[in-house]
């Protein structure tokens, strides 16, 4: 993957806009850190904003087992997400970033799983209201990872963009934290047409009520959806399936969304090394030497 690092290396002139970083997410083995699963309890926020209506709720403890493993505050496999959270919090303080687009070059690289886990970890911080948006109007899967049971037709983003429902009819709120979820809704025959309507700006106005917005976007290569969504976002995180995704396609994805908006690249499903100390040291050195950038 060294060519990806070289491709992301920025000139001194680019650095004034911020830094791109690489976060390495280890492959999660089924049941890892989950032999004694406990319920995930985030500190509740006592003063929820009264101007945000929400008709439905979900239980994060019903989420897919690997999502629960990451969200367990004491899990080792979730540590990289907590590192990412810390970097993003600093970026928010420095640059006011709060709308994060999660995408990948190709399908099946782990972008939806990453978006769900990142949103869940961000919502564990006290007094932070987080919205997870499933904006993949072609192949929505976030609801499955969150453990939401399908009852009839999901009302969601596509219905709102089509002018069929109000936002409160589509939103779900976690019973355990200030994590909200906006499903994709019914699959759209022409997602680009829906995303080009003025109603997308109305959706973005709702996003302003949250401290963080994490948007699961369709893959970049071959589709126009992500570019439309990116114009409403502050930063982009690109998920790359380690040692699988062709470098040329990663390069194409970076160029299509714009390198200046990418705040980080996630190398997903890396094989674990024997020594976690060596693992952390090696990849920190890789970022410094190959990427030529600092922290997010």
What do the predicted segments below correspond to?
Residues 1-296:
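P-loop NTP-binding module
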């Amino acid at each position: 993957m060294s060519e990806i690092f070289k491709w992301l290396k920025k000139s001194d002139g680019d650095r004034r806009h911020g830094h791109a970083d690489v976060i390495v997410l280890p492959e999660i083995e089924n049941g890892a850190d989950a032999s004694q699963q406990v319920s995930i309890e985030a500190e509740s926020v006592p003063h929820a904003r009264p101007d945000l209506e929400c008709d439905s709720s979900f239980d994060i403890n019903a989420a897919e087992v690997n999502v629960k493993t990451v969200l367990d505050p004491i899990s080792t496999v979730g540590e990289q997400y907590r590192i990412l959270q810390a970097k993003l919090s600093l970026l928010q303080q420095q640059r006011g970033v709060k709308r994060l687009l999660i995408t990948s070059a190709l399908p099946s690289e782990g972008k939806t799983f990453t978006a769900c886990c990142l949103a869940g970890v961000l919502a564990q911080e006290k007094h932070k209201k987080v919205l997870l948006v499933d904006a993949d109007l072609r192949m929505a899967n976030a609801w499955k990872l969150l453990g939401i049971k399908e009852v009839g037709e999901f009302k969601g983003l596509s219905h709102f963009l089509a002018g069929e429902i109000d936002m409160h009819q589509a939103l779900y709120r976690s019973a355990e934290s200030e994590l909200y979820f906006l499903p994709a809704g019914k699959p759209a025959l022409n997602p680009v047409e829906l995303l080009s309507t003025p109603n997308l700006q109305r959706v973005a106005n709702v996003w302003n009520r949250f401290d963080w917005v994490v948007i699961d976007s369709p893959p970049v290569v071959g589709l126009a959806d992500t570019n439309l969504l990116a114009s409403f976002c502050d930063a982009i995180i690109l998920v790359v399936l380690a040692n699988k995704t062709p470098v040329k396609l990663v390069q194409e994805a970076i160029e299509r969304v714009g390198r200046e908006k990418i705040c980080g690249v996630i190398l997903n499903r890396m094989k674990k090394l024997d020594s976690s100390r060596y693992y952390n040291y090696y990849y920190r050195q890789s970022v410094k030497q190959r990427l030529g950038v600092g922290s997010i």
